[in-house]
Amino acid sequence: MFDPFGDFATEGYLRNFDKEKDLEIVKIAEHELFRAQLPAALDFLAKRKQIEYADFLEVHRILFEGLYPWAGKDRAEVLPNSAVKKGALYFCHPRDCRLAVSEGWSVAHDKKLLDKRPGFIMGMFAYGHPFLDGNGRTMLLVHAELCFRTNMSVNWMRTSKQPYLDALTKEIQAPNDGHLDAYLKPFIAPQIPRDNWLQSVSDLPGLDGIDAESDVSAGYSDPAITKEYQEFERRRGYQLDNKRAH
């Protein structure tokens, strides 16, 4: 059980307002909240002249503030000294959440690149992993809006959950190799109206992203964790550009 706060026994899964410990119930609540708040989140994105990191956080808040007290707050604010990993895969250090997402913006805001590198963008969002839960839904909505503004879309209904998640995992591990770009290429399609997106998005495969409940949290104060994280970053072989944070 993912318990980064260390208080699951008294506060439930990720300190949800009901202190619910049954993960199946929590996930149902997440999904129903997402469906209910989806129009508001998409409307918010549609009105933004240029989407930035603060808007990424706001989408998460809109979707999940009815369930989690930390909704809309990233790991740098909530748990700045804790690593989040899944097996041998590490998400970025909390201090780099903004940098990682902004690295995705650097491609997303270039209309000549977005249709060629949609997987790179999604991979950077996933590596940034700003939130303790709800990353998959949040980044999917932001990614869809970015695609819309470039007169394109990803036909997510034609994708399959496990192959997508496998490609996403490889993308996080090796962002220079184009794993997710290659996976998504056959699914690139013309722009679709936002209303059509609204009707279908709640049932997309892989909506949760890489399942948060299987995450593990550990303090960077543990030398073994720090060493393992540094080794993962070395193998990953990608340097974030701190000039791009916005």
Regions found by a protein language model. Give the residues of each.
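FIC/Doc superfamily catalytic core
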Residues: 1-133, 137-246
